[in-house]
């Protein structure tokens, strides 16, 4: 496997785990000298310490412009995961009965946010409810 693909795999696995656990990614100080560099960098470091393939290609051994650890790359991978998850939900739905649930509320910084959920009957006849996402709502007044 190419070094790029191995780095990408390590980043994707790290991101998937953090998403499944509902943990934040970034730290306040991600410099190499920092003791707490954030969950993403810390978990990627742990993976590289325990997997010889990853340890050969991540961080210092990766080219400076291709470490696949920047916030932009993290967001791109997160968006790809979200698209694949939505696709899996739609396949599970199988074109059956569904409802869209929407609820808005102001977050801690007083910005309006809307949660979108999908309730549907899956292929097994079970009622499922899945969060599709949380979106910023610029104005709640018509």
Residue ranges: model-predicted function:
Residues 1-139:
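Extended, charged coiled-coil/helical-stalk scaffolds used for oligomerization and assembly
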């Amino acid at each position: 496997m190419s070094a790029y693909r191995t780095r990408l795999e390590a980043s994707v696995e790290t991101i998937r785990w953090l998403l499944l656990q509902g943990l934040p990614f970034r730290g306040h100080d991600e410099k190499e000298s920092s003791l707490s560099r954030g969950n993403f960098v810390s978990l990627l470091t742990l993976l590289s310490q325990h997997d010889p393939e990853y340890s050969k290609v991540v961080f210092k051994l990766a080219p400076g412009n291709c470490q696949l650890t920047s916030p932009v790359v993290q967001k791109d991978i997160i968006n790809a995961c979200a698209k694949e998850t939505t696709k899996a939900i739609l396949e599970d739905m199988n074109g059956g009965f569904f409802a869209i649930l929407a609820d808005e509320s102001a977050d801690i910084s007083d910005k309006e946010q809307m949660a979108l959920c999908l309730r549907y009957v899956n292929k097994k006849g079970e009622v499922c409810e899945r969060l599709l996402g949380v979106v910023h709502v610029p104005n709640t007044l018509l």
